[in-house]
């Protein structure tokens, strides 16, 4: 064992037996290396582990130096929204489909993780968004997002009329199916599918991407991440929602606005030493290979 990490948390909700096997392999391997290991409670229950230290995501965030998330990007997003509140590094083993946020190859995870545990890694901070549903600036509901905050109809698809204010200055009004407000991390997710730009993770920027706008002049907009975005609605309806990372939904009631701003805390994401953002883009998006 080394001095870089002493206590390691294992998190991620497995959706199939193969992923659960990775959790068990990781737990037993870390124990043989002499690390203190905290296993998320649900995982320990499903593995039927005996005499193991377990904890919630918050407890892992408070006690561990490193959290290893086993799963796909959805697992990473769900865990990271909580873990980002604490001084803990996070890395992922990809057991999902695309895996933009989960770098480690499950077939070679032990060797890659061994190098990381020896201190051979790249660290970066990814900012989150905070979404508030408020009435007369009185906060009523709040959540955070690592990828994006999305304005959309609750149940039945229909056009929404709304106004967008940036730092309390009117920017534009829009008739569309919704609006995607994305971080650089989320620029390769839902925002990309809607025609938004790809932002490198280190950019202090937020993108606003319209969803099926009812005008050809509506285009994605990139603003400084220090800006505050306010959404106001022309026709008060009770079926609008704000969703965070497609995992948490906040209903919007009549007379309420939505405020979106950068969070005060960051996700401390780490990667193997040979990590390259542009290589990841090329691999995941199927870009053409180098010509010469």
Curated annotation (Swiss-Prot):
Residues engaged in binding NAD(+): 73-74, 147-148, 158, 175, 177, 188-193, 247
Reaction catalyzed: NAD(+) + ATP = ADP + NADP(+) + H(+)
Any GO CC annotation of this UniProt entry: cytoplasm
Keywords: ATP-binding, Cytoplasm, Kinase, NAD, NADP, Nucleotide-binding, Transferase
GO molecular function, one term: metal ion binding
Family annotation (SUPFAM superfamilies): NAD kinase/diacylglycerol kinase-like
Enzyme class at the top of the EC tree: transferase
Annotated localization: Cytoplasm
Pfam annotation, one family: NAD_kinase
Stated family: Belongs to the NAD kinase family.
Protein name per UniProt: NAD kinase
The species this protein was found in: Escherichia coli O1:K1 / APEC
Organism placement in taxonomy: Bacteria, Pseudomonadati, Pseudomonadota, Gammaproteobacteria, Enterobacterales
Name of the coding gene: nadK
């Amino acid at each position: 064992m080394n001095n870089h990490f002493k206590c390691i948390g294992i998190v991620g909700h497995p959706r199939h037996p193969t992923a659960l096997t990775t959790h068990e392999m990781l737990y037993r391997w870390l124990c043989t290396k002499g690390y203190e290991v905290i296993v998320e409670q649900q995982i320990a229950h499903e593995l039927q582990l005996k005499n193991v230290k377990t904890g919630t995501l918050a407890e892992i965030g408070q006690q561990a130096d490193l959290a290893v998330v086993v799963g796909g990007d959805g697992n990473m997003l769900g865990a990271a929204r909580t873990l980002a509140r604490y001084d803990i590094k996070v890395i992922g083993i990809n057991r999902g489909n695309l895996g933009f946020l989960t770098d480690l190859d499950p077939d070679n995870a032990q060797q890659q993780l061994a190098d990381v545990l020896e201190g051979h890694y790249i660290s970066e901070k990814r900012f989150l968004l905070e979404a508030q549903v408020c009435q007369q600036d009185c906060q009523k509901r709040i959540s955070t997002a690592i990828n994006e905050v999305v304005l959309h109809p609750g149940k039945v698809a229909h056009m929404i009329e709304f106004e967008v204010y940036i730092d309390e200055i009117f920017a534009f009004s829009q008739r569309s199916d919704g609006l995607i407000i994305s971080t650089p991390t989320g620029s390769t997710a839902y925002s990309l599918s809607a025609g938004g730009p790809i932002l490198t993770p280190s950019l202090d920027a937020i993108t606003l991407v319209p969803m099926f706008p009812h005008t050809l002049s509506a285009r994605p907009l990139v603003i400084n991440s220090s800006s505050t975005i306010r959404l106001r609605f022309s026709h008060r309806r009770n079926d609008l929602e704000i969703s965070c990372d497609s995992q948490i939904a906040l209903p919007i009631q009549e007379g309420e606005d939505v405020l979106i701003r950068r969070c005060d805390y960051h996700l401390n994401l780490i990667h193997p030493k040979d990590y390259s953002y542009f290589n990841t883009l090329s691999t995941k998006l199927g870009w053409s290979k180098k010509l010469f």
